[in-house]
UniProtKB/Swiss-Prot annotation:
Its EC number is 2.7.7.18. Catalyzes the reversible adenylation of nicotinate mononucleotide (NaMN) to nicotinic acid adenine dinucleotide (NaAD). GO terms for molecular function: ATP binding; nicotinate-nucleotide adenylyltransferase activity. One of its GO terms (biological process) is NAD biosynthetic process. Keywords: ATP-binding, NAD, Nucleotide-binding, Nucleotidyltransferase, Pyridine nucleotide biosynthesis, Transferase. This is Probable nicotinate-nucleotide adenylyltransferase. Belongs to the NadD family. The keyword Lyase does not apply. Pathway: Cofactor biosynthesis; NAD(+) biosynthesis; deamido-NAD(+) from nicotinate D-ribonucleotide: step 1/1. The gene is nadD. InterPro entries: Cyt_trans-like, NadD/NMNAT, Rossmann-like_a/b/a_fold. It comes from the Bacteria. It comes from Shewanella pealeana (strain ATCC 700345 / ANG-SQ1). It catalyses: nicotinate beta-D-ribonucleotide + ATP + H(+) = deamido-NAD(+) + diphosphate. NCBIfam families: cyt_tran_rel, nicotinate (nicotinamide) nucleotide adenylyltransferase, PRK00071.1-1, PRK00071.1-3.
Length: 216
């Protein structure tokens, strides 16, 4: 099976995560996309709710959207969530699968600062979500990594790993920080959160400020 991997803090998960993943699945003809909540993200100070809550919200999305599954391998880990470590584990557990690691352009531009980033090319393909019409500057040092590995979606794949797909994605102007700020102000940003996530946040009194959450 062709499996997309979308990792993140999902603090909380919102349509800015869900819609691009759906577009990637459609364009690359993936069988599934696995949502993988991080436990301890190496590049962030922490999260605003527990790993259990973020995992539960991801499960709600998987229940609502059949194309998604939840991978809890990082959420259950007590050490930082390094992608190379995770993909090494996944390829051992599921050697029959072909993995596509989904990331945004910001993550790709800082990719060489990731822990053991070179290993990922032996474990999976990279899928970089970009705005339509966006091009990487010819002088950008990432061109040396991108150019020999860039692969067109329409062409057959020669191997189970090592290629980079640049996928045009509908721009989603949704920020987890802004979502949390609204929630802490007592505003439910209903346009960017699935109903199941809104209900979970309300029921569990997450991201609360001084006032009770109200509908936007």
């Amino acid at each position: 099976m062709k499996i997309g991997i979308l990792g993140g803090t999902f603090d909380p998960i919102h349509f800015g995560h869900i819609r691009p993943a759906q577009e990637v699945k459609q364009q690359l003809k993936l069988d599934e996309v696995w949502l993988m909540p991080n436990h301890i993200p190496p590049h962030k100070q922490g999260t605003h709710v527990s790993s259990q809550a973020r995992l539960a919200m991801a499960e709600l999305i998987a229940d609502e959207f059949p194309c998604f599954k939840v991978c809890d391998i990082e959420a259950k880990r007590d050490t930082p969530s390094y992608s190379a470590m995770t993909l090494t584990q996944l390829t051992k557990i599921y050697p029959q699968h072909e993995f596509y690691f989904i990331m945004g352009m910001d993550s790709f531009l800082s990719f060489t600062r990731w822990h053991e980033w070179q290993q990922l090319f032996g474990l999976c393909h990279l899928v970089v979500c970009k705005r339509p019409g966006w091009l990487l500057d010819d002088k950008d040092p990432m061109q040396k990594i991108l150019t020999p590995r860039l692969h067109d979606v329409a062409r057959p794949l020669p191997a189970k790993s090592g290629k980079i797909f640049m996928v045009d994605i509908t721009q989603q102007d949704i920020s987890s920080t802004q979502v949390r700020q609204q929630l802490m102000q007592g505003i439910m940003p209903s346009a960017v959160l699935p109903t199941s996530i809104q209900e979970y946040i309300r029921h569990n009194r997450l991201y609360r400020g001084d006032s009770s959450t109200k509908t936007d």
